[in-house]
Amino acid sequence: MSEKNPIVGLCQKASFLISAAQVDQCPPDEGLEVAFAGRSNAGKSSALNTLTHANLARTSKTPGRTQLLNFFALDDSRRLVDLPGYGYAKVPIPLKQHWQRHLEAYLSSRASLAGVFLMMDIRHPLTDFDRLMLDWAQASQLPIHVLMTKADKLAFGAAKNALLKVRREVQQGWGDVATLQLFSAPKRQGVDEAQMVLAQWLGLLDEDQEAFEEA
């Protein structure tokens, strides 16, 4: 499936565009962009790199190191955005609050934002920060696709049970905007499914492909 997905070839041409500390430093609000968010240490950088087949996000050993919105151009009208890691205990509270203010401003005001990938560690899902992201997405009626990362850390049955449990809660609270799946960067589990979501949000699928995905 991934060989037929146009997002793969496009991501191979991705290039760093700009880093922004706040919304007014972002690129012009036009075209389409998809953002990647996640609590620090939830595997956001690994997921982004695996989905794009590129080393777009530096996988750091120090969670929370990325403090800026990092934009990557796929072509003249499509972008990916690596949002700051959030929630790590060693980050000072004022800095956490600063990140939250600017994340909320970005999510609520960015017209070109087509959707958000939210990374949740399958062993520690639905943290306060995860719920906050879901609330922001719902308030803006913005599609949000949850990747339950590090699924390889659990046995298959346990991972499925965790998915079902979280899915029930997500559907009850944020079902109008949120979808979710299992994901493992090392095992490449769930990569094709997530790439299809990414391609759809960026307007890369034709009508036949979208109908197939919805069937």
Curated annotation (Swiss-Prot):
Its cofactor is Mg(2+). Residues 30-204 form the EngB-type G domain. InterPro entries: G_ENGB_dom (IPR030393), GTP-bd (IPR006073), GTP-bd_ribosome_bio_YsxC (IPR019987), P-loop_NTPase (IPR027417). Pfam families: MMR_HSR1. This is Probable GTP-binding protein EngB. GO terms for biological process: division septum assembly. Gene3D superfamilies: P-loop containing nucleotide triphosphate hydrolases. Mg(2+) binds at S45, T66. Signal peptide: none annotated. Transmembrane segments: none annotated. GO terms for cellular component: cytosol. GTP binds at residues 38-45, 64-68, 82-85, 149-152, 182-185. GO terms for molecular function: GTP binding; metal ion binding. Belongs to the TRAFAC class TrmE-Era-EngA-EngB-Septin-like GTPase superfamily. EngB GTPase family. Keywords: Cell cycle, Cell division, GTP-binding, Magnesium, Metal-binding, Nucleotide-binding, Septation. Necessary for normal cell division and for the maintenance of normal septation. NCBIfam families: GTPase_YsxC.
